[in-house]
Design a protein with these regions (language model features):
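Acidic catalytic cores of enzymes that act on phosphate-bearing nucleotides/polynucleotides
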Residues: 121-201, 217
Length: 283
């Protein structure tokens, strides 16, 4: 394979991120110019966001030829589909659908779809967005060693890693976590408990909230291994105000309770004691 080709001029998040993924996957240079005769027919050139053709088998990923009533889609969507990542990305990357809307419908229609004032859209930009897109737009060619190309490779690698490891993490949570009911009567709390396993994942609490979203379980709080010690972390789920962990700050085996009451750390490992602490934290 030779290169990734995308249009010159201004750059947007969709073509930038599509190129990031392709750089991470194939390690190719990027050419920023209009396609020349034969580029679309050359399987060694991946044509992104330009060319008027969506032919993945030939490496062509443009969406501008789709009719106006076509569902919101962008070049990033097409590349994610080709890489087999689209469904997970739509599920786990909340920013993807607004990106599709923004690129295919524009900022005003996107604001209306989101139910926000149109002025809010510009408030969501940051120097990270502005600088990376501007520096990318200024380039005619990018290759390994160029600072912009290297940052794009890192962005693509991190997105690949996030989607791959999150799916693995959800499978891990499903295999080990269980829902507990602690307390009695109206005082009952539903808690998702993640036991300590061997080996332990790097971040034991990672994926718990996503798992709850996927299963639709009604959960008040979480109990999970503390990655900094042998005990456990206790926290609210979705900032559930039925739990205030400042209420257990004075317990002998509680060594940390956040002043805002949403999380605590304990040296306790016995499940009965952990359940008792959750009940005592109930408002």
């Amino acid at each position: 394979m030779k290169a990734i080709l995308t249009h010159p001029g201004s750059a947007h998040k969709d073509d930038f991120l599509a190129c990031c993924l392709l750089i991470a996957r194939y390690g190719l240079p990027v050419w920023r110019r209009d396609p020349e005769p034969g580029d679309l027919d050359d399987p060694g050139i991946i044509v992104v966001d330009v060319g008027g053709e969506h032919e993945p088998e030939r490496g062509n990923f443009d969406h501008h030829q789709f009719p106006a009533e076509h569902e919101p889609v962008c070049s990033l969507s097409l590349v994610l589909q080709h890489l087999g990542l689209y469904e997970d990305a739509r599920t786990f990357c909340e920013w993807l659908e607004p990106t599709e809307w923004f690129d295919s419908r524009g900022p005003f229609a996107t604001a209306d779809w989101l139910g926000i004032e149109r002025s809010v859209v510009n408030r969501l930009n940051s120097p990270v967005d502005i600088t990376l897109l501007r520096r990318f737009a200024q380039k005619r060619e990018l290759e390994a060693g160029d600072p912009v190309w290297e940052v794009m490779r890192m962005v693509g690698e991190d997105l690949f890693m996030y989607l791959r490891t999150l799916r693995e993490r959800l499978d891990y949570v499903a295999a080990h976590a269980r829902v507990l009911e602690v307390g009695e009567g109206d005082e009952t709390l539903k808690v998702l408990y993640m036991p300590r396993t061997d080996p332990m994942p790097d971040d034991p609490s990672s994926g718990l909230s996503r798992y709850i979203e996927q299963t639709g379980a009604e959960i008040d709080g979480l109990i999970y291994p503390d990655r900094r010690g042998p005990g456990f972390g206790l926290s609210r789920h979705a900032d559930n105000e039925r739990l205030d962990f400042t209420r257990i700050a004075g317990e002998e085996d509680v060594h940390f309770a956040h002043a805002r009451g949403f999380v605590a750390k304990t040296t306790a490992t016995d499940l009965g004691r952990l359940a008792e602490l959750m009940v005592r934290a109930k408002v």
